């Protein structure tokens, strides 16, 4: 996280870009073995034959084309070719363009081709020694279930600002934006489909909803705060829990949020502005 935050501090991207970067980084790392296997097969080159910057660009491209539904294929290819031109040379850009377009063609001709790679150990994105241990301890069936569990996309959740619309109206509005959700708890919705569209909704941009995991908010629920309470959060950045507290104490309450890391405080300030909180 500290490396990502250093990049955020240097370039100061908006919330949409920051969130998108974090999703890509986390997912590519989680499925790194699988993505690298597919790159090797499609490009016809071993990892040592491709420079590290070009590997990173291909990983992003393969992730967006094969796994993510947030960006059209043509936009992925175009943006990554332009990125390659800006950091390398025309030869490298031509290589990236050729490999990504080959992947798109291969996928369009037979979307199921990738399933034939599932028998490779790299597909599981786990070190071989861990796979051997799991097979020994869990058996074949237990091993398969464990791998599927580790590699499945983690659920995404939306926190609702309790001072805004009723939950039924929020679910309806999200559905109209192509986002399928269901009630998870009093303050949270589980996203079943269309998570990539959440950051572009009007409700997100004006602070009516936020992306937050219920696990990270559990400590807030344990406090059992009431309307009008005054709460001091001394390890607050980037502010998701503080904003949750703010919605619970209401305009008659107050949250004093602080953190020792200046760059994280700045991130929190931007999110406070998005929510329009004055308390």
Question: Residue locations for each model-derived region?
Answer:
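S-adenosylmethionine
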Residues: 1-279
């Amino acid at each position: 996280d500290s490396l990502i935050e250093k990049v955020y501090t240097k370039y100061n991207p908006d919330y949409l870009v920051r969130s998108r970067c974090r999703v890509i980084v986390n997912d590519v790392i989680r499925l790194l073995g699988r993505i690298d296997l597919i790159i090797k097969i499609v490009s016809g080159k071993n990892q040592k034959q491709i420079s590290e910057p070009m590997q990173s660009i291909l990983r992003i491209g393969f992730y967006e084309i094969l796994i993510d539904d947030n960006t059209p294929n043509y936009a992925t290819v175009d943006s990554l070719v332009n990125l390659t031109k800006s950091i390398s040379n025309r030869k490298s850009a031509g290589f990236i363009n050729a490999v990504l377009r080959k992947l798109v063609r291969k996928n369009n001709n037979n979307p199921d081709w990738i399933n034939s790679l599932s028998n490779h150990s790299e597909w599981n994105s786990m070190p071989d020694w861990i796979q051997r241990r799991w097979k020994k301890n869990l058996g074949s069936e237990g091993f398969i279930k464990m791998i599927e569990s580790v590699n499945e996309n983690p659920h995404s959740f939306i926190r609702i600002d309790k001072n805004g619309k009723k939950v039924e109206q929020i679910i309806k509005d999200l559905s109209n934006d192509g986002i399928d959700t269901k009630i998870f708890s009093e303050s949270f919705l589980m996203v079943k489909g269309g998570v990539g569209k959440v950051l572009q909704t009007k409700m997100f941009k004006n602070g009516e909803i936020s992306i937050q995991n219920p696990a990270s908010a559990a400590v807030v629920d344990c406090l059992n705060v009431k309307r009008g309470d005054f709460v001091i959060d001394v390890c607050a950045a980037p502010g998701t829990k503080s904003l949750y507290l703010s919605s619970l104490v209401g305009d008659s309450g107050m949250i004093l949020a602080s953190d020792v890391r200046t760059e994280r405080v700045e991130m929190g300030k931007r999110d406070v502005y998005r929510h329009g909180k004055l308390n």
